[in-house]
Amino acid sequence: MANIDTPIPALKLNDGNSIPMLGYGTGTAWYKSGDEDKIDEKLVESIQTAIKLGYYHLDGAEVYKTEPELSMAIKKSGVAREKLFVTTKVITNIADIQNAIKTSLKKLQLDYVDLYLIHAPFFAKTDSDLQRAWAEMEAVQSSGLAKSIGVSNYLPQHLEATLKTAKVVPAINQIEFHPYLQHPPLLAFHKQHGIATAAYGPLSAVTKAAPGPVDDFMKALEKKYAVSAAEISLRWCIDQDIVAITTSGKGFWTNKFDANDRS
């Protein structure tokens, strides 16, 4: 992981808050299948390193059981809370969202999160289930426990159902997004309703899906700009105003190819 040479750009959400467009994830790659109380020291060290190098957007979730590690890394970093942007998600305790956020905050040892997401819509058997859950999310925001609220893995039909009764439009929808999974109709829906997009798995085309159709194009760009395929993948997201969340430990921006250079 390389030092950030220029500040990471921020995207203004529909509620007026801003989100850093590059986030460090503590998700699937770090999922704990065992006891949540057993601290993964490697993850703590990884998050600390990310923070030290300027990656202040930290993305977690209750289901990954890594909120304690995130808390420990934040505390050890010594970085002021107001400089950090912390996201967590609810799904395990979706039936009681207002208690779920309190549990997450206790594990994170924080008074609030910057962004709270419903992790997936698949708990819902009816539109009413989606609407009830979103009403609870709105209550969480009203209580001050989350500055912004949003969803993850929602498709247009889930968003449509939610918006029918929503008082607050979701600030963001975090989805799997990379060159092989671009979701044109969903992104169009987001744009129509002022919902920002965040991408998880943005490096999939150059990691999990390689070799593939974009390989030659990536190699040409790597040679042209003297940067890595990972940097190109992240820049591709940011150039589309899509927040990129990655668990990669490799370097991202360089002097020649940085987050603020839109040429």
Summary of predicted features, one role per range:
Residues 33-51, 94-109, 130, 157-160, ...:
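Short, acidic/polar
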Residues 1-83, 136, 204:
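N-terminal binding-site loop/beta-alpha segment at the start of enzyme catalytic domains
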Residues 81-94, 115-121, 177:
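A short, structured active-site edge motif that brings together acidic residues
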Residues 8, 47, 67, 71-74, ...:
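Generic structural signal for well-ordered alpha-helices
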Residues 120-263:
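Beta/alpha (TIM)-barrel catalytic core signal, keyed to glycine-rich beta->alpha loops juxtaposed to Asp/Glu
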Residues 21, 81-84, 111-115, 147-148, ...:
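Short acidic capping loops at alpha-helix termini that bridge into adjacent secondary structure
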Residues 31-33, 59-69, 91-97, 123-127, ...:
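Acidic-and-aromatic substrate-binding clefts and catalytic sites of carbohydrate-active enzymes
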Residues 98-118, 139-143:
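CE4/NodB-like, metal-dependent polysaccharide N-deacetylase domain
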